[in-house]
């Protein structure tokens, strides 16, 4: 359990805290009003992107680390096999979710950025086969 707790703090807690602080500072900066200007739509989109990225980070990684800690705790307390099997299955389900976080971030930035989203839409239109309508 000590090893699992250390791993959770070093490999999840610390990066999550650093990410949370950095994105939080960015969000605070974006929320500050500029003299003579209202809240621009680009600032709101940036705030939305920050919220989405942090939510996906938490949804992908929190279940994995909690489940892994519960698994090691159950092993330490010599829980019966049925409990260990249930926790092990949940762990195996959450592990790919944790790995998926690395793949999801670039996609999130791709789909939340106007420039890239418009280029992707244009690419999809160009690559889609054109239908000819005949009378």
From Swiss-Prot:
InterPro entries: GPCR_Rhodpsn (IPR000276), GPCR_Rhodpsn_7TM (IPR017452), P2Y4 (IPR000018). It is found in: Cell membrane. The chain crosses the membrane at residues 1-25, 50-72, 91-112. Keywords: Cell membrane, G-protein coupled receptor, Membrane, Receptor, Transducer, Transmembrane, Transmembrane helix. SUPFAM superfamilies: Family A G protein-coupled receptor-like. The keyword Membrane applies. It is a multi-pass membrane protein. GO terms for cellular component: plasma membrane. GO terms for molecular function: G protein-coupled purinergic nucleotide receptor activity; G protein-coupled UTP receptor activity. The keyword Cell membrane applies. Expressed in brain, heart, stria vascularis and vestibular labyrinth. Residues 73-90 are extracellular. Its main location: membrane. It comes from the Eukaryota. Residues 26-49, 113-135 are cytoplasmic. Signal peptide: none annotated. One of its GO terms (biological process) is transepithelial chloride transport. Belongs to the G-protein coupled receptor 1 family. PANTHER family: P2Y PURINOCEPTOR 4 (PTHR24231:SF21), PURINOCEPTOR-RELATED G-PROTEIN COUPLED RECEPTOR (PTHR24231). Receptor for ATP and UTP coupled to G-proteins that activate a phosphatidylinositol-calcium second messenger system. Not activated by UDP. This is P2Y purinoceptor 4. It comes from Meriones unguiculatus. The gene is P2RY4.
């Amino acid at each position: 359990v000590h090893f699992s707790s250390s791993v959770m703090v070093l490999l999840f807690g610390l990066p999550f805290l650093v990410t949370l602080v950095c994105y939080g500072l960015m969000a605070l900066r974006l929320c500050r009003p500029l003299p003579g200007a209202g809240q621009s739509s680009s600032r709101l989109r940036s705030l939305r992107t920050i919220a989405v990225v942090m939510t996906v980070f938490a949804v992908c990684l929190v279940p994995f680390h909690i489940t892994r800690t519960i698994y090691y705790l159950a092993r330490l307390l010599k829980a019966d096999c049925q409990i260990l099997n249930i926790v092990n299955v949940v762990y195996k389900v959450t592990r790919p979710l944790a790995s998926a976080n690395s793949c999801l971030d670039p996609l999130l930035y791709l789909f939340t950025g106007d420039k890239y989203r418009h280029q992707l839409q244009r690419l999809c239109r160009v690559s889609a086969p054109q239908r000819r309508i005949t009378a």
